[in-house]
Amino acid sequence: MERGFCMFTDASGQQIAVNARLVWYVKANQPETTSLIFFDRDHAVSVEGTLDKVITKLRDAYN
């Protein structure tokens, strides 16, 4: 996985890679909650929580 991308699983179980700078995934049944696995070089960081928490985690990874 290239730096700056995150991987998430949608409601159908399909895994989707998206640019972490641009896109986040909001769970259909819990719109206030976001679940991402963020890949940065050789490690992955799973982030689950409020949208603010996820955005903060992604921002901190790049700053």
Locations of regions flagged by a protein language model:
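Acidic, Ser/Thr- and proline-rich intrinsically disordered linker/docking segments
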Residues: 1-17, 21-63
